[in-house]
Amino acid sequence: MLEILKKSLKKAPIVKRGKYPYFIHPITDGVPAIDPKLLDEISDYIIEYSDMDVDRILSIEAMGIPLATAISLKTGIPFSIVRKRQYQLPGEIKISQSTGYSKGELYINGIEKGNRILLVDDVISTGGTLRFLVKALEEKGVTISDIIVIVGRGDGVQQLAGEGIRVKTLVDINVSEDGVSILEDTGETN
């Protein structure tokens, strides 16, 4: 299961970003090109193993866009994107967030109190982005059916679990200067 994803992760090049070894992958970076078969495999898996009884799919730009698009096209469920730019629309939610890599603001539009959403993201490391996003959505009165992240690295999933936020990952990895290794199933994937 998820063989295309696992194989592509093992081939991912590694670069150094500050003190972090960072993997470059189509699903997390859009580089190199995203293979439609990879996106198809991932979206099929998410649809099969997620609670799809939702009003909306919500994902984070930039790399959440192809994921949400693929799922939306297959299910007919509309999607909204958490943006890094403010639009000043009525009901816009502003989130100040900090991750292991950056700080900044995110903006949510098109989600209303009482909505039930599937939250999809490309990668989790520290859990910072999801922590702030979940808190903002809950304060707005939005129900999150599932949180699905394609690639888990670091201890973000465990940190969020300790705060009562359950995140499902498709694949958990370890990244070193030598490359990406796939970790054994953690039981959090489905």
From Swiss-Prot:
Specify the domain of life of the species encoding this protein.
Answer: Archaea
Instruction: Name the InterPro entries for this protein.
Output: HGPRTase-like, PRibTrfase_dom, PRTase-like, Pur/Pyrimidine_PRTase
Q: Where in the cell is it found?
A: Cytoplasm
This enzyme catalyses:
IMP + diphosphate = hypoxanthine + 5-phospho-alpha-D-ribose 1-diphosphate; GMP + diphosphate = guanine + 5-phospho-alpha-D-ribose 1-diphosphate
Looking at its record, which EC class is this enzyme? transferase
- This protein's record includes keyword Glycosyltransferase: yes
Q: What is its EC number?
A: 2.4.2.8
Family indicated by similarity: Belongs to the purine/pyrimidine phosphoribosyltransferase family. Archaeal HPRT subfamily.
Q: What is this protein called?
A: Hypoxanthine/guanine phosphoribosyltransferase
Q: Species name for this entry?
A: Methanohalophilus mahii (strain ATCC 35705 / DSM 5219 / SLP)
> What taxonomic classification does the UniProt entry list for its organism?
Archaea, Methanobacteriati, Methanobacteriota, Stenosarchaea group, Methanomicrobia
